[in-house]
Design a protein with these regions (language model features):
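Sequence-structural signature of mature extracellular/luminal beta-sheet repeat domains
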Residues: 1-186
C-alpha cells in the first residue's frame, strides 16, 4: 500500500492507485524526472554511465543517453528543458530542444566543481545544485581526482547572467535538494 504523509498527495494520485515496478536492471537509479513534451520519465543509472527513459504509453524502457558522463540529478527548467548534474564533466548542463547539450557551469572562481549531484530549478529560473565529492572519490561513478575547491557546497546559478554563488557552505557532503511549496525553505 501507499502511506500518505501529506494530504496534498491525494490531489495527484487516486486512492485506487497501486505501486508497480515497470523495469529493473539499473545498478542504482537517481534523478528521475518527467519530461512532459516527450511524455517520458528519464533517470540516471550512475555506475552504468547511462540515462534511461520510460515511456508509459508503450510500457518500454530504453536508453536515453549512453555514455552519460556519470549523470546524477535531473530536473527541468521553466521552458521544459532537461537540466542535469554530471559527475565526470563536473558540470550542470542543459539538453536543448535539438538534443545538443549546453554546459551551464563547470567552475567556481576558476576551479573545477567536484561532482554536481542534485539539482532543482526555482520558479524565478535560478538553478540550485549540490556539489559533494562522490564523483571524484573513485572511477566507479566519475573520475578519481583531488578536489580543487576548499569544500563541498550548495550553489545558486543564474542562467541568464552566469552568476554562480555559494548558498550553503557548512555541509560535509550535501546531497538532495527540494524547495517547500512556497519556496521559502530549501
Amino acid at each position: 500500500g501507499i502511506e500518505v504523509i501529506d494530504e496534498r498527495f491525494r490531489e495527484l494520485v487516486s486512492d485506487v492507485s497501486e505501486v508497480r515496478r515497470h523495469w529493473k536492471g539499473a545498478e542504482w537509479s537517481e534523478g528521475a524526472v518527467y519530461l512532459p513534451e516527450q511524455n517520458v520519465i528519464v533517470w540516471s543509472d550512475i555506475p552504468n554511465n547511462r540515462m534511461l527513459q520510460f515511456d508509459p504509453e508503450s510500457n518500454e524502457t530504453t536508453v536515453f543517453r549512453e555514455p552519460s558522463n556519470f549523470t546524477n540529478g535531473n530536473t527541468i527548467d521553466r521552458e521544459g528543458r532537461l537540466v542535469t548534474a554530471t559527475h565526470l564533466t563536473h558540470c550542470v548542463s542543459r539538453t536543448e530542444r535539438d538534443g545538443s547539450i549546453t554546459i551551464l557551469v563547470d567552475r567556481y572562481e576558476g576551479k573545477r566543481l567536484n561532482s554536481p549531484n542534485d539539482v532543482v530549478v526555482k520558479s524565478d529560473g535560478t538553478i540550485w545544485f549540490t556539489d559533494p565529492p562522490y564523483g571524484i572519490l573513485s572511477n566507479r561513478e566519475g573520475e578519481e581526482r583531488d578536489s580543487e575547491l576548499e569544500g563541498n557546497f550548495v550553489y545558486r546559478l543564474d542562467p541568464e547572467t552566469g552568476d554562480l554563488s555559494i548558498v550553503a557552505d557548512s555541509m560535509d557532503r550535501p546531497n538532495g535538494l527540494a524547495f517547500s511549496p512556497d519556496e521559502s525553505r530549501l
